[in-house]
Amino acid sequence: MKLPIYLDYSATTPVDPRVAEKMMQFMTMDGTFGNPASRSHRFGWQAEEAVDIARNQIADLVGADPREIVFTSGATESDNLAIKGAANFYQKKGKHIITSKTEHKAVLDTCRQLEREGFEVTYLAPQRNGIIDLKELEAAMRDDTILVSIMHVNNEIGVVQDIAAIGEMCRARGIIYHVDATQSVGKLPIDLSQLKVDLMSFSGHKIYGPKGIGALYVRRKPRVRIEAQMHGGGHERGMRSGTLPVHQIVGMGEAYRIAKEEMATEMERLRGLRNRLWNGIKDIEEVYLNGDLEHGAPNILNVSFNYVEGESLIMALKDLAVSSGSACTSASLEPSYVLRALGLNDELAHSSIRFSLGRFTTEEEIDYTIELVRKSIGRLRDLSPLWEMYKQGVDLNSIEWAHH
């Protein structure tokens, strides 16, 4: 077993060796290095064929038509293209958008930008377990609502939203539905031939593909229109200009092919490991599970350890690569906005750790993690005056702290 142990698969994943090997064939003079838009010679044709194969592999995993897959630089761009693109195209119908407070920043900040441009956005608060109440969503829908954006799996707490039911509600009212599926694709089954989803964002690097590549699914029947955000040579049916990075696209395609093959068995394996981890730490005093095991992705476990400062816990767990909140927010000292939206107080939000497991996680690593967490929590609480006061029965909320 190698230390440190990587348990931050929701931030990024290593590229699968099979993917890396495939990508190497599309870069050098000996490989297929041509521009797929070069229609006048074999170098271009071969590159175009490689892109077509990858497009099919991605479409296969999610039950889409390959013509519905638009390549982007990643899920952040896909979210931007979907939300801005749909809002701008359909603004004559209305300027109201609905999303949730626990979406990824790429969705929230895109909506904030649209608010500055005159759109109105409703931010739904989830229930305590992170799941959106569909009655609240329905109540928020208006005649001028043109777009709903609610993610599939949350990147911090792993809860799974009922995208099938949300899709039905949107379709019945003629509202475009966008789903950020970054954390679910290749991990949970997605069948866009059945789901009433109009736009869906995908990433390469969360599922053992390369960074810097993603895709946006844009439904053809019934046809969904978006306005391009990147202009140029008219690539990707005019929706996203820019020379296609063949090596990255091939890598993403191969990663999605592997995911389709291994998904069923791998998810059972990860669910077993996640449950093993939770069962190993859940009897520690004052430990809280954030999210919902039953309605949760099999690879994410978010836990708060009361009376332990999250930062000091991460330092104590230096043999584990884990995060507090998401990679995007863990660089700041703000408590996670996702956990705050669930109703956690600052203290509990600050003392949260996200464990996210993946393809190369072993049982041995999980057992080591359990032992290390138990030891570290014990040691940190021995040093904590707050823990001592709690054990003495002092109500910490009633204390007036002096401000210096």
Curated annotation (Swiss-Prot):
Disulfide bonds: none annotated. Changing residue 328 to A: Loss of cysteine desulfurization. Pathway: Cofactor biosynthesis; iron-sulfur cluster biosynthesis. The active site is at residue 328. This is Cysteine desulfurase IscS. It comes from Escherichia coli (strain K12). It catalyses: (sulfur carrier)-H + L-cysteine = (sulfur carrier)-SH + L-alanine. Its EC number is 2.8.1.7. Master enzyme that delivers sulfur to a number of partners involved in Fe-S cluster assembly, tRNA modification or cofactor biosynthesis. Catalyzes the removal of elemental sulfur from cysteine to produce alanine. Functions as a sulfur delivery protein for Fe-S cluster synthesis onto IscU, an Fe-S scaffold assembly protein, as well as other S acceptor proteins. Preferentially binds to disordered IscU on which the Fe-S is assembled, IscU converts to the structured state and then dissociates from IscS to transfer the Fe-S to an acceptor protein. It comes from the Bacteria. Treatment with N-ethylmaleimide inhibits sulfur transfer. Activated by ThiI and TusA.
